[in-house]
Every structure is written in structure tokens, then in C-alpha cells.
Amino acid sequence: MQVRQITSERHLAYIAGRNSVSFLQTPAWGKTKTGWSSQSLGWFEGEELIGAALILLRKVPKVEKYLAYLPEGPDLNWDSSKDVEMALSALVTFAKARGVFQLKMGPHTWVRRWHAQTLKDVIAQGTVKTIGEVTPDEINANGINLLKQLPALGWRQRKAEASGFGDFQPRYVFQIALTGKTEEQIFEGFNQQWRRNIRKAEKEGVTVRQGTITDLPTFHVC
């Protein structure tokens, strides 16, 4: 397995065939990162593209050394321990050849899930201080295996800090399932204060519409 740089067009074509890829792993995201350069990478078995990633690079002043970061990536088959080991070994080889002294990534996979009601209950009880203390409703066995495998391969999970290179993503993400629900059903899922705020905004003339790229200049003026 090898890692090679690919074009943005090929990267986007690969993403189009995937079920779910973070927007932080699209070529467009690299263009928004001030102070970073970016490349699209491809994982190949022979000439078959089997994985892809956006890698962000930040140069150290005065020397040809780089900090590399793959936000919520790379996009690989994280469920296969054998594939993970080969893919990450190929990534490290690629990075070292290009002067990378520190390589960070954020696999876009989940380990534990909590239902909204579960979190509401423990918040009301006031018995815990962090989400990690709450017994999860679901556990992803593949995610647990990945947490064990990565340290064995030499990777270390660091604590997110408020300052630094801005190279960490939130470890806990709240997601609202919209599929199969009406607007009213979604609205009923909000707490009372949120519903009041939404109604107040509507009365004051706040509207929501899908924008286009032509709206960006107006957005930045605001």
C-alpha cells in the first residue's frame, strides 16, 4: 500500500462515492486555513484508489520542517485492523519523506453514543461532571478496537488545549436526527427556551434561506 498526492478533482470524485466524509476532509477546506498549505492524498493498492485525505501542513520558520494535520481524517476503512496498520504505516512513510516532524489525525469514527434523554436525566440529577462519566447507550466495538490499536502502533491521544495550532476537533459531537421527521416534530424536540427564542426571532422578521457563493461578500461585511 502506498500514499501519493492526488489532484483535487480525483479527491472529490472519490468522496462522491463514499457514504459519509467530513467537510474538513474536502479540498475546499484547505483553502480556508490561513497559515497552512494543503494537499490531497490517496491510498493506493497497485493503481486502485482505496482511501483519501486532506492533509494540512504548517511550516516551521527558517527550516524545512512541517507540522501535519488530517482533520477528521483520513477517510479509510477503520473497521479492519490489518488495513489500518498498513494505511498508517504508508502515511508515516509519506510524511517523513516530506519533512514532517509531527503528524496528527482525527479518525472520523465513533466509539460511544449517548441518547439525548440519557444526558438530560444525568444533568437533572447533577451526579456527574463530564460526559465520559455517563454510561453510554451504544458502544462501537470497532471503535474500541481502534482505540487499543493506535497506541500499539505508536500513536498517542493528547488532551485538547485552548491554545496552540488549532489542530484538534471536539471529541464529543451532538447530532440531531432529521430523517423521517417533520419540521414540527423537530421543533417539539427543542427545550422550551429554544422554542421561545425561535418564535421571537420569527416575529421580529428573521428568516432562513439557502444561500449561494454570491452571499459571501455580504456575510463578511457583517
Locations of regions flagged by a protein language model:
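Residues that form or immediately flank small-molecule/cofactor binding pockets and catalytic motifs
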Residues: 8, 60, 213
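Conserved donor-binding loop and adjoining core beta-sheet/short helix segment
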Residues: 31-135
